Amino acid sequence: ITHATPASFIAHVPHRKAEEEIATYFLKTEIDFFLGGGKKFFDQREDDDRNLYQELKEKGYQVSDYFKMDFDDIVVNKNKNFAYFTANESPLPKSQGRDYLPYASRVATSFLKKRGQEKGFFLMIEGSQIDWGGHANESEYIISEMLDFDKAIGEVIDFAKRDGETLVVV
């Protein structure tokens, strides 16, 4: 969640590798829902002794992570902002068992629709490991990530069809 693409929507830092600094921006915003890797930049910090994971809870977020509970078992409270950490650092590739992206997309659209009935919402979903597979020149990695991302986008398109007022940009 602290990588360049998702972080660019909330954080403004001079370097993409400033992930501990990026993590602090999650406490400076009222982001409704976020899910992704990078837990260590919240609760195992090297630059200071802050526990941003705990600070999110104190700010009223419903916070959990893969160590405590599978994402499939989470009951999301629409009355609280939501944070779930899928990995301590970067999430596993799809080929190594990561299987939550389509389900998380469905949960996020439902949650955000309930939260933003009047004003609407913006949701950014990244298939970042497609790029990583490309850099590694690993075709199977790329294909498995693209298929997983396609399923996630399918969930969003299904939501948009039901909703009738949603624009999907891929």
Show the residue positions of the predicted features:
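Active-site His/acidic residue clusters
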Residues: A4-F9, E89-P93, G116-G120, M124-E155
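Generic beta-sheet signal
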Residues: A83, K119-I125, T166-V168
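Functionally constrained cores in energy, signaling, and assembly domains
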Residues: S105, T109, G133, A160
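Glycine-rich phosphate-binding loop signature in dinucleotide/nucleotide-binding domains
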Residues: R115-E118, R162-G164
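Metal-dependent active-site segment of extracytoplasmic phospho-/sulfohydrolases and closely related
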Residues: L147-V170
